[in-house]
A protein has these predicted regions:
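Mature catalytic core of soluble alpha/beta enzymes
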Residues: 1-117
Length: 117
């Protein structure tokens, strides 16, 4: 994002990386921020407690799908995905909690974030 990176990931081997978030593409109307990602259940802009989700996966299609799915599902969706053997995630919520998949070589750069267990 424009404020800088939260951290960095060291990858061994190739993979696809997709990030979903509402921090760059949004519209603010009467003080309320509307994300560009549409909730498929309501047809309205997504309301979520996450600010960003990044997925590392062997498939570009899957990484894009998963980053959007997890972002729209919010923090209640994260636990289902943190221990996957098929992909890894890094996500942050509005309270600056950080969610990182087990086994992902992630280095935190921004000390204002804290790891969420």
């Amino acid at each position: 994002n424009k404020q800088g990176s939260i951290g960095s990931v060291t990858l061994r081997g190739g993979c696809f990386i997709s990030t979903s978030g509402g921090y760059e593409r949004y519209e603010e109307i009467d003080g309320k921020r509307y994300c560009h990602i549409i909730d498929t259940k309501t047809g309205y802009p997504t309301e979520t407690d996450l600010t960003t989700v990044t997925v590392f996966c062997d498939s570009g299609l899957e990484s894009d799908f998963l980053s959007t799915l997890i972002f729209t599902g919010g923090t209640k969706e994260i636990e289902k995905h943190l221990s996957s053997d098929n992909y890894k995630i890094v996500a942050a919520d509005k309270d600056k909690n950080l969610y990182v998949s087990d086994g992902l070589d992630f280095k935190l750069k921004d000390g204002s974030y804290k790891y969420k267990q």
